[in-house]
Amino acid sequence: MRHYEIVFLVHPDQSEQVPGMVERYTAAVKDSGGAVHRLEDWGRRQMAYSINKIHKAHYILMNVECGEEVLEELTTNFRYNDAVLRNMIIRCDEAVTEESPIMKAENESRERRNRAERRAQEAESAAEEVEDEESLDEEADDESSEDESEEA
């Protein structure tokens, strides 16, 4: 069996069908004794050029190990499925299991965004604590000034 990298683009109106399509394709690979080494759903993205006046598509990346028969079956499925706008199959020398550069960049930006949100929440909670302390101090000052005015 050989290793392949498969990328296919799904029509944006058919995005809800993507999990079912991926499940069918992975089942076809696994049923024949193959393996799916990497599966990434890149989501809906802007295409480099429009296809049939469509500017966005749902991108899926799969790294699989399978035989020629299964590969031909997948190719046929891609060709006759109207929801699949484009597909690309590349033969690889070995299984690729690490994250793709696109997913790495997305995960890094998500982590940065989460850290920034956490910092903002921490700063907000710290500011609220300071305000609470200040209001307590003001109340204590008001009470002490009232006590002093009563004594006089």
UniProtKB/Swiss-Prot annotation:
Organism expressing this protein natively: Saccharophagus degradans (strain 2-40 / ATCC 43961 / DSM 17024)
HAMAP family per UniProt: Ribosomal_bS6 (MF_00360)
Keywords tagged on the record: Ribonucleoprotein, Ribosomal protein, RNA-binding, rRNA-binding
Taxonomy of the source species: Bacteria, Pseudomonadati, Pseudomonadota, Gammaproteobacteria, Cellvibrionales
NCBIfam families, A to Z: S6 (TIGR00166)
InterPro entries: Ribosomal_bS6, Ribosomal_bS6_sf, Ribosomal_S6_plastid/chlpt, Transl_elong_EF1B/ribsomal_bS6
Biased composition range(s): Acidic residues: 125-152
Segments of this protein annotated with the region Disordered: 96-152
Gene name in the database record: rpsF
A GO BP annotation: translation
GO CC terms in record: cytosolic small ribosomal subunit
Function: Binds together with bS18 to 16S ribosomal RNA.
Protein origin, superkingdom: Bacteria
Family membership: Belongs to the bacterial ribosomal protein bS6 family.
One Pfam short name: Ribosomal_S6
Protein's name according to its UniProt entry: Small ribosomal subunit protein bS6
Gene Ontology terms for molecular function: small ribosomal subunit rRNA binding; structural constituent of ribosome
